Amino acid sequence: VLKQGDDERFRLLNAFKDDTGSVLFATDSFWEGVDVPGDSLSQVIIVKLPFDVPSDPVFTARSELIQQRGGSPFMELSVPQAVIKFRQGVGRLIRRGDDRGVVVCLDRRIMEKRYGQIFLHSIPDCKRMYAPLSEILGAVGEMI
């Protein structure tokens, strides 16, 4: 079991690539510039949709500008930025034509909120399942 913060990023990635039985726990910062083709990466688990922190000063300033012109900061800024990060996370899994794997998103909002469809439509077509976690785990076990 490897986790972000235990070692330098490049060392963690090398250890993860070298041991196909390892598990790497990391935040969305590992979604950019990471290439782990082949059997080392077979699953990506997204615990929550990657929305930016609304208290960030740059985010707050952009939100205020959108609001001043009568727009929706959530739909015009928060959702598009989160969708880009989400696509990056999903994109870690399939890097070559022969790669296969499973993405599990544990955030119910992807299915229960109207904006969740924007996330789903942003990724390539694939088999999708919305079910209790126990059923999802069983299906993942069969796929891998």
Task: Please name every model-derived segment.
Residues 1-144:
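ASCE RecA-like P-loop NTPase motor cores
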